[in-house]
């Protein structure tokens, strides 16, 4: 998830430094007790590459972060949102960033890794 945040900044975006202090939300974005289970759902944006890969409108994701996208970087398209409106994934051309940890989510995230490998 740190890479997601760094990518956003590299594209000229900004971050909330501490979600609990800077945003009102009922979503726990830092569920350290259960890092390998879904903490909340995200809504995928139809027409994005991520939506095409996953094929679902809503998926459950783990959530281990205290920072998040404030202003989205230039040229990035938001491809998933948490129920509180926080951007949880973005993309552009050959770049895909997700705020969750797909490596800890099991087989349901295999398509993300397949897309990455095929893009090499």
Residue ranges and their predicted role:
Residues 20-120:
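Amide-donor transfer/coupling interface in amidating biosynthetic enzymes
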Residues 17:
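Acidic/charged, solvent-exposed loop-and-adjacent secondary-structure segments enriched in E/D, K/R, S/T
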Residues 1-14:
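Catalytic nucleophile loop
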């Amino acid at each position: 998830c740190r890479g997601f945040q760094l990518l956003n900044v590299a594209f000229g975006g900004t971050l909330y430094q501490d979600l609990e202090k800077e945003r009102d939300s009922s979503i726990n974005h830092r569920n350290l007790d259960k890092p390998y289970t879904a903490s909340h759902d995200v809504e995928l944006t139809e027409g994005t590459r991520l939506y095409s890969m996953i094929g679902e409108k809503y998926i459950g994701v783990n959530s281990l972060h205290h920072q998040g996208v404030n202003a989205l970087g230039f040229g990035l398209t938001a491809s998933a949102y948490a129920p509180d409106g926080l951007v949880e994934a973005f993309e552009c051309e050959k770049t895909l960033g997700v705020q969750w940890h797909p490596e800890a989510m099991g087989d349901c995230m295999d398509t993300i890794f397949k897309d990455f490998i095929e893009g090499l």
